[in-house]
Design a protein with these regions (language model features):
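Alpha/beta-hydrolase active-site loop
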Residues: 85-105
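Conserved alpha/beta-hydrolase "acid-adjacent" motif
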Residues: 237-243
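Short beta-strand/loop motif that positions the catalytic acidic residue
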Residues: 224, 230-232
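Catalytic active-site module of serine/aspartate enzymes centered on a nucleophile-bearing elbow/loop
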Residues: 258-292
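Short, surface-exposed "cap/lid" segments of acyl-processing enzymes
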Residues: 22-71, 75-76
């Protein structure tokens, strides 16, 4: 695996990894992690005997040019210089276009899919929504992505009292500590920047993806025409239940879109559970090959 370090528009250094280099313009897949983790999330499945690699290697074996992102404050990318310096919208407005532009430059514009888990999926969709809203009058420019797949990405559903309390507690704890202590709580291998997780949680508490300038990202999904596959874990009862993932699929304006519910898989299990090899991962591969 090779790594290149690139600069976002605000000067933040991002790490972008490539599983293997190709020169034949084969379709590519950019894997984008969510909160509390990094690009290594895609490299290993935790519930099997080991040795077979994770979803990244599975996609590579299927013939795709696989790229792995480290969003700001994660993995090999730059860390937040001070608490609350960055927000979730920095992932959307700065990191997403920087990563995609670099890949398209290196691959001579080969077809590229964004495959994101949880908030990493939302970041890609929100970027496309913003791009669609800012597009010039017809004819529109070619879309930057040929497909989007999200694993466990929920819409801004109405939270019950317990979930609302937990989300509000997450925001308060993050602001008090300057970070969310995911490692100490054993829910991830990286602590999350307070501003990033805070904005994402606030969107869910408020029931809408509304940016700091008032732009309604969720409403803007209607302008996203890129083919879209949403995947939900049938055993995910808390983070991204199927009903919440269905909200996103229903809102996206693409003619080609679908929701797949994978029985028995949890939120993180969509990527980390070895059982994903038997259904979830092959289904994603089939959809990508039909689309790219």
């Amino acid at each position: 695996m090779s790594t290149r370090h690139i600069s976002a528009p605000d000067g933040v250094e991002l790490a972008l990894h490539r599983l293997r280099a190709f020169r034949d313009r084969r379709p590519g897949v950019l894997l984008v992690h969510g909160a509390f983790t990094n690009h290594r999330f895609w490299l290993h499945a935790t519930d099997g005997a080991g040795g077979n690699g994770g979803l990244a290697h599975f996609l590579g074996a299927a013939g795709f040019d696989v790229w792995l992102a480290d969003l700001r404050h994660h993995g090999d990318s730059a860390r937040e210089p001070r608490p609350l310096a960055w927000t979730f919208e920095d992932w959307v407005l700065r990191d997403a276009p920087t990563l995609v532009t670099r890949i398209r430059e290196e691959t001579d514009g080969a077809p590229l899919a964004w495959l994101g888990h949880s908030a990493g999926g939302a970041a890609g969709l929100c970027w496309l929504a913003r791009s669609a809203a800012a597009a010039p009058p017809p004819p529109p420019p070619p879309p930057p992505l040929a497909a989007v797949v999200t694993l466990g990405t929920p819409g801004p559903r109405s939270l019950g009292p317990l979930r609302r309390t937990l989300a509000a507690s997450t925001i308060a704890m993050s602001r008090a500590l300057g970070r969310f202590p995911a490692r100490a709580l054993r829910i991830g291998n990286e602590d999350e920047a307070a501003g990033i997780i805070g904005e994402w949680m606030e969107w869910n508490v408020r029931g809408g993806w509304v940016g700091t300038d008032g732009f309604d990202y969720f409403a803007g999904l209607a302008g996203v025409k890129t083919p879209y596959l949403g995947v939900a874990g049938g055993a995910d009862r808390f983070f991204a239940p199927p009903a919440a993932c269905r909200q996103v699929v229903a809102r996206v304006g693409a003619e080609r879109k679908a929701l797949a519910i994978e029985p028995g898989l949890s939120h993180r299990g969509l990527v980390l559970d070895e059982r994903g090899r038997s259904s979830c991962w092959p289904n994603v591969v089939v959809w990508l090959k039909e689309t790219l």
